[in-house]
Amino acid sequence: MKAQTALSFFLILITSLSGSQGIFPLAFFIYVPMNEQIVIGRLDEDIILPSSFERGSEVVIHWKYQDSYKVHSYYKGSDHLESQDPRYANRTSLFYNEIQNGNASLFFRRVSLLDEGIYTCYVGTAIQVITNKVVLKVGVFLTPVMKYEKRNTNSFLICSVLSVYPRPIITWKMDNTPISENNMEETGSLDSFSINSPLNITGSNSSYECTIENSLLKQTWTGRWTMKDGLHKMQSEHVSLSCQPVNDYFSPNQDFKVTWSRMKSGTFSVLAYYLSSSQNTIINESRFSWNKELINQSDFSMNLMDLNLSDSGEYLCNISSDEYTLLTIHTVHVEPSQETASHNKGLWILVPSAILAAFLLIWSVKCCRAQLEARRSRHPADGAQQERCCVPPGERCPSAPDNGEENVPLSGKV
């Protein structure tokens, strides 16, 4: 029934455009059954809806959405977009130089999820009418990420994707064994989904893997986490931390980024990063060093020189591309050197002793002044001598002679 309707529509349209009802008798028209194709597009990218026909004169092309909305119209050798639905304005065009060769494909710019659906192309020529159906499906898969977070005393791995459509398949593995994860956080909109999938790994030394799959786009992303054994170093020493990509995920022809970070107060500060696309290396820590020869061999191990006590903590190497994220974490414990420890021990003894001595001195001075003030108030005449005398409590200063003579040895008196 639909085919008959389409045929009648084009017979009327073509004959009316030719200016004569009798130029193309009905017997000369050939109806070609509808073909159906599926086209998959990505959000905000351009696509082509294919349609072809046998070459003929007086070509008429109409593209419609859901058989109702006019997407694009072409006849008499040019576009006629007066009745085009506004949502398609400035987004569609034909391959005009190829129409004469039987190409009625539609170039579609910046597709959105609202563009999903069935598109029908009606093509009429002087001798035939064809209809081609195209089913457009649109997918979204912004690059996911794997993050490591500290929440109070707990450690979490989080696999997240900011925008994805349709709803993805997320799986977790621990030491290559599938595990269940029931804490997925999902927010949806008309355009896409935003998904976070956290996993508590507190106290675990296992390796973890998260996979996010978009079945429509046939695209899979993998995040992998590995914890290395803890390292104990002395102050002023240096430490070497390994970071190498896994061959199963790494592709040398694919752009990627490497970032080394150190965690302090629950947040990571970037020590250095490397961009494969530009071979550019940025180092934010003067004691950090990379071996360029190793980098050329895809080995991103690093050295940190002249360690100090504040360097204790977690160090994270992140290798990321559009298809994977590889996280490697090291825990470094920096301990005081023996010289520093002995020095600190001496300070622990010396400082309290000095504080005690200072306290006793201050106390003695205060006591002495109090005694002098008390004696001055009882014997004002002896004030000058009392100011020069300070004795322990319970004792008195020697009394001055009553006759005013100077104190001399008894043997010196006449």
Curated annotation (Swiss-Prot):
Region listing for Disordered, in residue ranges: 383-414
Membrane topology note: Single-pass type I membrane protein
Every Ig-like C1-type domain range: 138-222
GO biological process, one term: T cell costimulation
Keywords in alphabetical order: Disulfide bond, Glycoprotein, Immunoglobulin domain, Membrane, Repeat, Signal, Transmembrane, Transmembrane helix
Glycosylated residue positions: 90, 103, 318
Induction: Up-regulated in antigen-presenting cells in response to inflammation. Induced in dendritic cells in response to IFNG, poly(I:C) or heat-killed Listeria monocytogenes (at protein level).
S-S pairs: 159-210, 243-317
Domain Ig-like V-type as annotated: residue spans: 61-131, 235-328
Keyword Signal annotated: yes
UniProt tissue specificity: Expressed at high levels in colon, kidney, testis, lung and pancreas, and at lower levels in small intestine, liver and skeletal muscle. In immune cells, highly expressed in B-cells, dendritic cells and macrophages. Not detected in T-cells.
SMART domains, per database record: IG, IGv
Coiled coil: none
Signal peptide positions on this chain: 1-22
SUBUNIT field: Interacts with TMIGD2.
Function: Through interaction with TMIGD2, costimulates T-cells in the context of TCR-mediated activation. Enhances T-cell proliferation and cytokine production via an AKT-dependent signaling cascade.
Protein name: HERV-H LTR-associating protein 2
Organism: Homo sapiens
Upper taxonomic lineage: Eukaryota, Metazoa, Chordata, Craniata, Vertebrata
Name of the gene: HHLA2
